[in-house]
Amino acid sequence: LNYGIFLDNSYQSDFNFGASNDRFSSFGAHGGEMDYYFFYHSKLADIINSYTFLTGRMELPPLWSLGYQQNRYSYYPETEVFRIAQTLREKKIPADGITLDIHYMDAYKLFTWNKNRFPNPAAMNKKLKDMGFRTTVIVDPGIKIEEGYGAYERGIKDDIFIKYPDGKNYAGEVW
């Protein structure tokens, strides 16, 4: 018997497909609506097709993103990034991406580049792409509190930061 069940419920759910008794199966949720869908087909591929027809089919990610990504804390300056990329190519180690950690930033401010370590990010990225690499930069969910820093100033102006119950902007440590 080939079937699939989709329980459309955000509450804690329990599924028992023969764990305690191989003649008994059950599923349920601790609240909410019991909206469920039952799929039956002779082929597993058809069950998955019916399920994704209902829930949607995601786009495939770019092929390069599924390949090996060279990453560590942290590659800098730009010459070190190129050295790593060249070494991977010389040793014929397959790699599709290189990730830059926090040291690419200017004083750890998101959406900025440290121009001493990475004087021309666009040219660096082009050269890496010509070598067959895609560049990914780390983006942490924190905006540095610093007068004159564009992202911080815009956040204050547009009043978009998370607030404490007393209305003051939330501040926390990222690193």
Locate each region found by the language model:
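Carbohydrate-recognition beta-sandwich/jelly-roll modules
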Residues: 1-95, 122-135, 139-140
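Short acidic, glycine/serine/threonine-rich loops at helix termini
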Residues: 17-19, 109-112, 146-153
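Short, solvent-exposed loop/turn segments at the edges of secondary structure
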Residues: 31-33, 63, 106, 155-157, ...
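Conserved short loop/turn motifs at secondary-structure junctions
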Residues: 68-75, 100-117
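Active-site groove signature of glycoside hydrolases
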Residues: 96-101, 171-175
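Short, solvent-exposed turn/loop segments enriched in Gly/Ser/Thr/Pro and often Arg
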Residues: 98-104, 139-147
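Aromatic/His-enriched, Gly/Pro-containing loop or helix-boundary segments
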Residues: 106-121, 165-175
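Active-site-adjacent "subsite" loops/lids of carbohydrate-active enzymes
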Residues: 141-175
